[in-house]
Amino acid sequence: MPRKSVLDFAKGRGAYVWITAYDYPTAKAVDEAGVDGILVGDSLGMVLLGLPNTLGVTMEDMVRHTEAVARARPRALVVADMPFMSYETGPEDALRNAARLVKAGADAVKLEGGTEYAPIVERLVKAGIPVMGHIGLTPQRFLTIGGFKMVGKTEEQRRKILEDAKALRDAGVFSIVLEFVPASLAREVTQAVDVPTICIGSGPHCDGQILVLHDVVGLTERPPSFAKKYADVAAAIREAVSKYAEEVRKGLFPAREHYRE
């Protein structure tokens, strides 16, 4: 099947399935599972590197992991996160950094923020770089929103998120992630814009869903309440490594078929 492009994402084409991946083998696996989009998320800082938040993720981190995912040559669309302070300093810095991610193999970039970053989105789109928006809970701004909690419960917040969605739409995003907002607000935003909305922790009314792979397969110690675990890979790893350790200590591995004289 041909690789997907941003033109394949539009309203009314079913529910889009997105998931994160950060390296070659997981990108290959999730693509073979049939997802529509792969996000090389700055969440890698927390789920891979053990950081307490995403603020410490660098452009070098994002370029390296985007390259790894792109080497899997996935059919799915590959979107790379723009990390903290890679675009906030102005349109030209944003363009330079977004171009690095595209050269690393991303089909598009994602950036957090609403109306205030619409000019940056517009600059990137005019330069030929597709952009996915991200509003609601924006993890790079957890210090200013009081932590990792639901956003959009007050009338002021709801109005701001709606304004943000429309501003991003007008700036040219091809899609918008809505993170951890009330389902009723996600439905309102989805009805208000003509680009696909992708929910994470925001209910069933968006045009698609996205989750962090490590939450889905059971590799996260404390997954968010809105995630669902579909497998327990951590338990499988513990079991496999325990058996390996036991066989080494008992002299059962390597067996004759595992080596040559």
Curated annotation (Swiss-Prot):
Gene3D superfamilies recorded: Phosphoenolpyruvate-binding domains
Cofactor annotation remark: Binds 1 Mg(2+) ion per subunit.
Catalytic residues as annotated in Swiss-Prot or TrEMBL: 179
Catalysis: reaction(s): 3-methyl-2-oxobutanoate + (6R)-5,10-methylene-5,6,7,8-tetrahydrofolate + H2O = 2-dehydropantoate + (6S)-5,6,7,8-tetrahydrofolate
Keyword tRNA-binding recorded: no
Subcellular location: Cytoplasm
InterPro entries linked to this entry: Pantoate_hydroxy_MeTrfase, Pyrv/PenolPyrv_kinase-like_dom, Pyrv_kinase-like_dom_sf
Pathway stated in the Swiss-Prot or TrEMBL entry: Cofactor biosynthesis; coenzyme A biosynthesis
GO molecular function: 3-methyl-2-oxobutanoate hydroxymethyltransferase activity; magnesium ion binding
Annotated positions binding 3-methyl-2-oxobutanoate: 42-43, 81, 110
Annotated binding of Mg(2+), by residue: 42, 81, 112
SUPFAM superfamilies, per database record: Phosphoenolpyruvate/pyruvate domain
GO cellular component terms attached to this protein's record: cytoplasm
Disulphide bond pairs: none
EC identifiers of the protein: 2.1.2.11
Pfam families on file: Pantoate_transf (PF02548)
Subunit architecture: Homodecamer; pentamer of dimers.
Function according to Swiss-Prot or TrEMBL: Catalyzes the reversible reaction in which hydroxymethyl group from 5,10-methylenetetrahydrofolate is transferred onto alpha-ketoisovalerate to form ketopantoate.
Name under which the protein is recorded: 3-methyl-2-oxobutanoate hydroxymethyltransferase
Organism encoding this protein: Pyrobaculum neutrophilum (strain DSM 2338 / JCM 9278 / NBRC 100436 / V24Sta)
